[in-house]
Amino acid sequence: NNPAIAYLLEGNSMVDQKLVMAHVYAHVDFFKNNFCFQMTSQGRDARDASDVRKWIDAMANHGAIVRKWANRIGIEKVEQFIDACLSLENLIDPQKPFLPKDFSPKSSDDEQEEVETPEVPLLRVDREYMESFINPDEFVEAQKKKLADEAEQALRFPVAPERDVLGFLLENAPLQRWERECLAVVRAEAYYFLPQMQTKIMNEGWASYWHSRLMTENICDASEIVDYADRCASVLATTPGQLNPYKLGIELFRHIEDRWNKGQFGKEWDDCDDWELRRHWDRRTELGREKIFEVRSLYNDVTFIDEFLTEDFVLDQKLYSFGYNERNSRWEIESRQFNEV
């Protein structure tokens, strides 16, 4: 929503309220600035006509649509159809929000005429007795098969694979009006929440990074710091075999900030293989804060991890590969190798 709206639970303690506000403010900053959310922050819904800057209203409209058809068709029938749609809600195209909006696949109503297979183009022969040598049966059959495959490809629908399965169904499936409207609701919301899935680690890491700084440097007083530390520890706790996006995100942002503050980047750093020199490397460049704001804007989880998850970070954070030992009935470290992690 624009402006963003957040809610506080009335029964929370004051420490919890402060923590939630600090955390949510950082989330809002991420929503407003990360490229994955640019369609929502600019008011463009990638796949339908609603203005996503007013998603409080859009969600209310979606609810009104569903209730309208539930009253007319029956709540059980509508719920069953929506459940079926929700089972497909991840079958959308992550790239489509960044493409032009002129999404117009061929209509299934268009009659496709049967395509006749053209005659096989034979090589010219001046002498009839040379025909079997110049155009042998194997060659003719191969050419016939090639032409038949091309004719079949021309009849295929859609001609090219379509990643946005929900959009394809919306445009081409023989749906009743109420089914089409309900499917459009599910699809619009799937696209709206897509950036959340693409940036879960970064988003939670950014919010945790800033709530940690705000709470310890500006907001908490001495009487609240222990309670805050207890709440924060429970959020950042990790267990073997599980990935905590809050913990991984905050530590990776801190790692980036520390590296760029010390100048641990660039060709000279990459080419250095002296472990002792790397351990004490500090060029005092102080570019860490600038770098993490750049990362916040230009990366998603895949590129974030691919670019900044280094072997040094894995060793420092003990991000080992765990496996379950059935003999001991417990999780154990299987590998400490960076590539396997």
Specify the residue positions occupied by each region the protein language model found.
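Non-catalytic terminal regions of proteins
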Residues: 15, 227-341
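Long, low-complexity, polar/charged, intrinsically disordered or flexibly structured peripheral segments
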Residues: 109-172
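Hydrophobic/aromatic-rich, well-ordered segments within soluble, folded domains that form packed cores
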Residues: 186, 194-217
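Active-site recognition of the HExxH zinc-binding catalytic motif
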Residues: 15-32, 204-212
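Post-HExxH zinc-binding segment in Zn-dependent metallohydrolases
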Residues: 31-108, 208-221, 234-245
